[in-house]
């Protein structure tokens, strides 16, 4: 039996009447959750050891029940996004040899052949997740149980108010929300989720339960929470992952929730947690202090000690489906970074790097400076082709202010090289986002090039 099943069973036995799951219209105690899991597992008797099972119910509570029910049958849950098209689901099922699908409590057998049907499954896999993105087929990856149990322990160290409730209003198909849910149920806490993020109804629900609460969000959600201007004394910890929050956002959060600790995480679906920034105590523009026992390498460093970040820890995944990792292998994050006094500084994604006149330009470094300007909501630097320089940088931004190019150029030149200063500025109404709530860089770039912004 998986340890997460043992942990869950412990709290079912100890606290059967404690709330386990809260999703708007559905509330389940630990005892009720246990019965639902058992009944579901009886429906899925045909699932055999290590067979992959796609979870695609429209209601997240059903997917959580089925997640544990599949484990009781010895299968491997595959976390689908309920908004995916039938065509995408068919492609994923065929590509990754997903033998079964569950929707509306019905188990359906898949008859398609796959190139991975003879693959050796890594040890202690608890599910298969999928990378998010706006283009191409999501990549399937193995998440092993030990990596999350280690992550749970690191989380516990950072929660300082004996939080009894864990909130993650994002889709369970995203690693952050699913992680928060399994973490809550493995530690006897109440998990609150939402089918669709609604900050006002979320605040009302947290206030009604009136328990010490930790909330897992992405920066776009943080901004929406700020916009509600609703105080909630129950919120004791805010854990944000996906992008660095600005000083202005931190100050607004501190004003709205003075009792709460703000903990920013940097990590990836593959590597899990890499660094953390507790109440912005790390140096400006750093993404925080490296977690204990996270080893790092900077590959192909330049003269400024900037290199491609690779990490190794007990929290990393077990590889992509078809490309399983060797235990203890290094995970390349795709980020250019440097490290100073155990604090990690990101300068940009490898895929986002712009080469202006032969000089490497990293968008993240420019964006962080722009985000420090009062009145700026979001900033994005993209590279577009240029006959003379190869590429030039373009700044897209949203907010209440109208930036003046000469003033911005003067401001940036004090801290950046000439090649790093964007050649053009464009104010836009809003950004486009990926499924996980991050700015969709490629889509924004294409729309700018095509004159659609």
Curated annotation (Swiss-Prot):
Q: Does the keyword Lipid metabolism apply?
A: yes
Q: Which GO terms describe its molecular function?
A: medium-chain fatty acid-CoA ligase activity
Enzyme Commission number(s) of this protein? 6.2.1.-
EC class of the enzyme, as a word:
ligase
Q: Which UniProt keywords apply?
A: Fatty acid metabolism, Ligase, Lipid metabolism
Among the GO biological process terms of this entry, one is: fatty acid metabolic process
Please name the InterPro entries in this protein's record. Answer: AMP-bd_C_sf (IPR045851), AMP-binding_CS (IPR020845), AMP-dep_synth/lig_dom (IPR000873), ANL_N_sf (IPR042099)
Keyword Ligase on this protein? Answer: yes
List the Pfam families hit by this protein, alphabetically.
AMP-binding
Q: Which family does it belong to?
A: Belongs to the ATP-dependent AMP-binding enzyme family.
- Supply the name of the protein: Putative long chain fatty acid-CoA ligase VraA
Upper lineage is: Bacteria, Bacillati, Bacillota, Bacilli, Bacillales
């Amino acid at each position: 039996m998986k340890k997460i099943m043992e942990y869950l069973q412990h709290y079912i036995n100890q606290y059967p009447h404690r709330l386990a799951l809260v999703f708007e219209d559905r509330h389940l105690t630990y005892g009720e959750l246990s019965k639902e899991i058992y009944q579901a597992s009886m429906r899925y008797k045909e699932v055999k050891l290590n067979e992959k099972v796609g979870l695609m119910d429209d209601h997240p509570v059903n997917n959580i029940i089925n997640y544990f029910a599949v484990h009781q049958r010895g299968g491997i849950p595959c976390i689908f996004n309920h908004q995916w098209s039938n065509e995408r689901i068919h492609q994923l099922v065929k590509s990754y040899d997903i033998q079964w699908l569950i929707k509306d409590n019905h188990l359906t057998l898949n008859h398609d052949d796959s190139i991975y049907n003879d693959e050796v499954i890594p040890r202690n896999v608890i599910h298969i997740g999928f990378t998010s993105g706006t283009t191409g087929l999501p990549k399937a990856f193995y998440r092993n149980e030990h990596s999350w149990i280690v992550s749970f322990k690191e989380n516990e160290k950072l929660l300082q108010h004996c939080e009894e409730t864990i909130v993650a209003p994002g889709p369970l198909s995203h690693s952050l929300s699913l992680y928060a849910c399994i973490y809550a149920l493995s530690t006897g806490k109440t998990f609150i989720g939402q089918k669709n993020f609604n900050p006002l109804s979320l605040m009302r629900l947290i206030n009604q339960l009136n328990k010490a609460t930790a909330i897992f969000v992405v920066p776009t959600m943080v901004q929406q929470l700020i916009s509600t201007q609703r105080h909630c004394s129950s919120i004791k910890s805010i854990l944000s992952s996906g992008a660095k929050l600005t000083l202005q956002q931190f100050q607004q959060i501190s004003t709205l929730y003075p009792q709460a600790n703000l903990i920013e995480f940097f990590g990836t679906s593959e590597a899990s947690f890499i660094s953390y920034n507790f109440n912005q105590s790390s140096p400006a523009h750093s993404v925080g202090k490296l977690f204990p026992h996270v080893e790092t390498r900077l590959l192909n460093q330049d003269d400024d000690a900037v290199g491609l970040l690779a990490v190794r820890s007990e929290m990393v995944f077990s590889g992509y489906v078809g490309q399983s990792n060797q235990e203890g292998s290094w995970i390349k994050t795709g980020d250019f970074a440097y490290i100073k006094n155990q604090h990690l500084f990101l300068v940009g994604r490898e895929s986002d790097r712009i080469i202006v006149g032969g000089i490497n330009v990293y968008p993240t470094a420019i964006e962080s400076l722009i985000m420090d300007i009062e009145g700026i909501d979001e900033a994005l630097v993209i590279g577009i082709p240029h006959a003379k320089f190869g590429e030039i940088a373009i700044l897209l931004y949203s907010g209440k202010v109208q930036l003046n190019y000469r003033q911005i150029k003067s401001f940036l030149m004090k801290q950046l090289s000439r090649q790093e200063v964007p050649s053009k500025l464009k104010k836009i109404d809003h950004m486009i986002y990926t499924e996980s709530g991050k700015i969709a860089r490629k889509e924004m770039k294409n729309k700018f090039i095509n004159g659609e912004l």
